[in-house]
Amino acid sequence: MTTPHGLLQYSSGAFSDQVPADDSAEEHGVKDHAMLAPFTAAWQTAISPPLVIERSEGCYVYDVNGTKYLDALAGLLSTALGGSEPRLVKAATEQLNKLPFYHSFWNHTTRPSLDLAKELISMFTAREMGKVFFTNSGSEANDSQVKIVWYYNNALGRPKKKNIISRTQSYHGTTFISASLSGLPTLHQDFDLPGRFVLHTDCPHYWRFHLPGETEEEFATRLADNLENLILKQGPETIAAFIAEPVIGAGGVILPPKTYFEKIQAVVKKYDILFIVDEVITGFGRLGTMFGSDLYNIKPDLVSLAKALSSAYAPIGAILVSPEISDVIHSHSNKLGTFAHGFTYSGHPVSCAVALEALKIYRERDIPGHVTHVAQRFQEGIKAFAAGSPIVGETRGVGLLIATEFTDNKSPYELFPFEWGVGEIFGQECKKRGMMVKVLGNLIAMSPPLIITREEIDKLVSIYGEALKATEERVAELKSKKN
């Protein structure tokens, strides 16, 4: 759904394009199933059983009926190495046979967790990092970031320095803290969120929010000034951290305008505010660099990782902590007797073994280099179809990440009625042709596995073009009915 101000919201899809349940739903045991499904409305389950994916192979997935789909969203922007990488399966199997689980509490741990922490510190080169804390997801990583920041400021005798600044349209997860950080109203509605410790500043979407005649650099300057004014209004002594994705991902694939991060970093540094970079989507090659911080010259104090960390073969997330922060945490834990934060599965040996092998593959195969090699074909192919479409307002992307936003007359302000479900229509047209995309209201996003070939990109682009034409025809019908 798109609000009058253009803020993207998660939606359950168009009512008119759901496929009614059939006999196969009973056969496969999915009709009236027992799951409380994430980001799914009850009516969807009632009229349409879930699409059950049974197996994967490379960039493709297969449902229980044997239908093959090109997975143009890599699971949820996560299966970077595709769905059948034998080295990851082998790493998991060997670790399961050797040591399926042991914890990392009370000065105990396992070899895979130690090795993975060392490898992550080595791999992240945007600035020096000191320690790694393991979680099970990106949501947990961002949730833990806030606790670490609070702990750090308490240790320094700054109990008032607790508020976190995030951005509208951002997505940082769905736990209490990470959903509060997220700038999407749907994640807050009737969950009594966001928490009072979160402040939201401007979304850096130039196309939608720039003033008439304003250049990208001028837009970035205005947003940096707005951030500084927010800090001064609240009091710099109350602001602990600023969190941002290098490219806003699940909130609509929003790229930073020119000079944005240069100016934002100058502001937060001026007021002794920590910079948390959320690399959950952009980490490990998605943008054509190993990390988004490399592409946009971000020098963070803390980094959140997940998704491609294990190519989603096993649940795992991580936080990279700067030496300055980790030194304070160590000193304060000595004073208190412990650093009392962690999860049963922090540093799970199987997840760490899989992630360690994934990192080796990223380096050995130069996955960021491959992304750079094929990204132009991907970006230009999609944009060529979108440029001539009367229903596409903007197509934006970098590397193997792209979004198409549907608006009328190519205007950011002439929005299609939500009930038309234009994005969902496009998504269904893709699915009919054997391709999965991510639908977010009147926007669709694509983020294929990073191993995608030029031939597979050509197929993806071809399906995109066919689906776009079919969607244009459907929108024309809806317009004629409206008139």
UniProtKB/Swiss-Prot annotation:
<dbReference type="GO" id="GO:0009102">
    <property type="term" value="P:biotin biosynthetic process"/>
</dbReference>
<dbReference type="Pfam" id="PF00202">
    <property type="entry name" value="Aminotran_3"/>
</dbReference>
<dbReference type="GO" id="GO:0009448">
    <property type="term" value="P:gamma-aminobutyric acid metabolic process"/>
</dbReference>
<feature type="binding site">
    <location>
        <position position="171"/>
    </location>
    <ligand>
        <name>substrate</name>
    </ligand>
</feature>
<comment type="function">
    <text>Transaminase that degrades gamma-amino butyric acid (GABA).</text>
</comment>
<dbReference type="GO" id="GO:0030170">
    <property type="term" value="F:pyridoxal phosphate binding"/>
</dbReference>
<comment type="similarity">
    <text>Belongs to the class-III pyridoxal-phosphate-dependent aminotransferase family.</text>
</comment>
<dbReference type="InterPro" id="IPR015421">
    <property type="entry name" value="PyrdxlP-dep_Trfase_major"/>
</dbReference>
<feature type="binding site">
    <location>
        <position position="307"/>
    </location>
    <ligand>
        <name>substrate</name>
    </ligand>
</feature>
<dbReference type="InterPro" id="IPR049704">
    <property type="entry name" value="Aminotrans_3_PPA_site"/>
</dbReference>
<dbReference type="GO" id="GO:0034387">
    <property type="term" value="F:4-aminobutyrate:pyruvate transaminase activity"/>
</dbReference>
<keyword id="KW-0808">Transferase</keyword>
<keyword id="KW-0963">Cytoplasm</keyword>
<dbReference type="GO" id="GO:0005737">
    <property type="term" value="C:cytoplasm"/>
</dbReference>
<dbReference type="InterPro" id="IPR005814">
    <property type="entry name" value="Aminotrans_3"/>
</dbReference>
<feature type="modified residue" description="N6-(pyridoxal phosphate)lysine">
    <location>
        <position position="307"/>
    </location>
</feature>
<keyword id="KW-0663">Pyridoxal phosphate</keyword>
<keyword id="KW-0032">Aminotransferase</keyword>
<protein>
    <recommendedName>
        <fullName>Probable gamma-aminobutyrate transaminase 4</fullName>
        <ecNumber>2.6.1.96</ecNumber>
    </recommendedName>
</protein>
<dbReference type="InterPro" id="IPR015424">
    <property type="entry name" value="PyrdxlP-dep_Trfase"/>
</dbReference>
<dbReference type="GO" id="GO:0004015">
    <property type="term" value="F:adenosylmethionine-8-amino-7-oxononanoate transaminase activity"/>
</dbReference>
<dbReference type="InterPro" id="IPR015422">
    <property type="entry name" value="PyrdxlP-dep_Trfase_small"/>
</dbReference>
<feature type="binding site">
    <location>
        <begin position="138"/>
        <end position="139"/>
    </location>
    <ligand>
        <name>pyridoxal 5'-phosphate</name>
    </ligand>
</feature>
<feature type="binding site">
    <location>
        <position position="278"/>
    </location>
    <ligand>
        <name>pyridoxal 5'-phosphate</name>
    </ligand>
</feature>
